[in-house]
Amino acid sequence: FHAWSTSENLNELQLVSSIEFGKAPANNPRLSRSLLLELISSMPEEGWFGIDEFVGYVHDLQPDILRRAGEYDAWFIKDSETGQPLIGFQHWREIEGWYVQMMIQGPFTWFGLVDLGKSAEAKTSMCFRRSRWADTLLKGRAPEYPTTESRNFILDKNGHIIIDRYFPRDIRYQVARFCDWDAQKGNRYEYRI
């Protein structure tokens, strides 16, 4: 996470597939990333936030996240489907808005900074929340994962097996192959022979 967040060489703006550039974008990817990470770190730890609402929040609070000093007419950008030029501040949502959305649904999710959510009918993510690792990652530390595997399980006289989630994965796989799935209760998986 630290290597990515401080990189000058990775430019996520080039991952926004809905836009094309006449020449390489003259943005500062590290600064843009840093500004977005600051906004994420200032958000409440609990609750879900609409991606569109967050894009609007960035628009109101930090509109120059990509094109610094009002360079809205200086970059030659066009819509990749229609070829229409996207010049001027009126196209902020198509450029900066898509960038913010892509960062949430892409790198912020890939690195475990945010969790995504959507309704059953939606095709793409509609909301996000800070993950349980967000504070740790934003402070430059690696998240802690369980280091020890559980060796405890229950096998009762009725052929009911209860295995802890942290039981060795290869053994859980074998149990799942020869048993019928029963239920998951918290961090425990239940099977029946």
Predicted features, each with a name:
Residues 2-193:
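Extended alpha-helical interface modules used as scaffolds for assembling large macromolecular complexes
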